[in-house]
């Protein structure tokens, strides 16, 4: 039954709020991200019972088209460290199915739009301290151990791949800026007359994403005699 995920007071899945950023959890998630601009982001979750451990990359046909292939290659390489760590303790796992890397509004993908490498880790729930499963007994402590080992493996990978991860993020910003300069459309002008409150919250959200918006310096008339007035129009 809905809601079926971890929610805040308003029944909102806080892990889907990073684009809209309408709740304290999403807003603070963005603040933390832009404070650090991390090279690697891990979003650790608890999934349905009886499922093996999951780690990124997600389904190869469900990746956002703006996410570079190199991002997915680095994701797979980092995950190979996780696989080795789980192999050592006999924990079963799966990857490249069941989950996607498409929606940028969640923790396991937002950074993919900013030069980070994001990973999702999902541990099957014991629904308590002990659960019998077809593959044996699962204890709550065992689930914690899996997540802890996966975290340590990710840190090990990030250290070993440090120079390449730094280079990837640098190249990502350089390439996207270069591609933007080649676009025929270099900006958008929008009017706020009659919708001041909507405009206020829109501008507020752009600021949360560190997207620069400027007030129009002078009156402007666009094609089709559309008029934009200084003081009530903005360019992004």
Identify the residue ranges that each predicted region occupies.
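Detector for the c-type heme attachment site
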Residues: 46
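Intrinsic-disorder/low-complexity accessory segments
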Residues: 8-17, 22-28, 32, 36-37, ...
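Glycine-rich, aromatic-flanked loop segments that form ligand/cofactor-binding clefts
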Residues: 1
């Amino acid at each position: 039954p809905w809601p079926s995920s971890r929610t805040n007071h308003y029944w909102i899945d806080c892990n889907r709020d990073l684009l809209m950023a309408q709740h304290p959890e999403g807003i603070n998630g963005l603040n933390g991200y832009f404070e650090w601009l991390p090279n690697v982001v891990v979003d650790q979750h608890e999934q349905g019972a009886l499922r093996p451990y999951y780690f990124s990359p997600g389904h190869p046909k469900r990746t956002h088209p703006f996410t570079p292939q190199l991002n997915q290659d680095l994701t797979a390489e980092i995950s190979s460290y996780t696989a080795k760590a789980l192999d050592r303790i006999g924990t079963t796992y799966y990857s490249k199915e069941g989950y996607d890397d498409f929606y940028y509004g969640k923790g396991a993908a937002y950074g993919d739009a900013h030069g980070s490498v994001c990973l999702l880790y999902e541990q099957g729930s014991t629904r308590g301290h002990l659960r019998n499963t077809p593959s044996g007994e699962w204890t709550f402590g065992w689930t914690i151990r899996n997540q802890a080992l996966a975290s340590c493996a990710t840190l090990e990978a990030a250290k070993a791949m440090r120079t390449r991860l730094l280079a990837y993020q640098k190249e990502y910003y350089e390439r996207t800026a270069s591609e933007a300069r080649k676009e025929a459309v270099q900006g958008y002008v929008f009017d706020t007359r009659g919708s001041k409150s909507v405009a206020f919250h829109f501008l507020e959200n752009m600021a949360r994403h560190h997207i620069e918006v400027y007030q129009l310096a002078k009156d402007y008339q666009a094609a089709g005699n559309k008029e934009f007035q200084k003081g009530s129009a903005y360019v992004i």
